[in-house]
Regions:
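Non-transmembrane "mature" sequence context
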Residues: 1-122
Length: 122
């Protein structure tokens, strides 16, 4: 499956995307800093399905900051072999063991619980 095919599934889990400029504005940084945060696995930046430019799922930003615990969670998911697309699918898909979506648990400051779930992904 191509990366484009992989991204098509994100339409069903990510409701709202921010352009790079919008994400930068919400974070109070430059677009190049947003790209750097992505390279550092602190944030996910990619081309959304049907999108023309790079974008960030809006729910990864809360109160002008990257959601607390997101970076550590993305690192764990990457270490388990998940791509950025797969990581977003996991974050935005309900998990009955939490309960709810991992992104919601992170937004509720339950990062440790989310990372424990991420560590057992095979």
């Amino acid at each position: 499956m191509s990366d484009l095919d992989d991204r098509a599934g994100l339409d069903h889990v990510v409701d709202h995307w921010l352009s790079l400029d919008e994400a930068a504005e919400r974070l109070g940084v430059t677009p190049s800093r947003v790209r750097q945060l992505s390279r550092e696995h602190q944030l996910v930046v990619l081309r959304p399905p049907g999108g023309r430019g790079l974008a960030v799922p809006a729910e990864l930003i809360l109160d002008g900051q990257v959601v607390k615990g997101l970076g550590g969670t993305l690192t764990v998911l990457s270490d388990r072999g998940l791509s950025d697309v797969e990581s977003l699918e996991w974050l935005f898909t309900a998990d009955s063991s939490l309960p709810g979506r991992p992104i919601d648990a992170l937004r509720e400051n339950r990062g440790r619980e989310v990372r424990r779930r991420a560590q057992v992904i095979v």
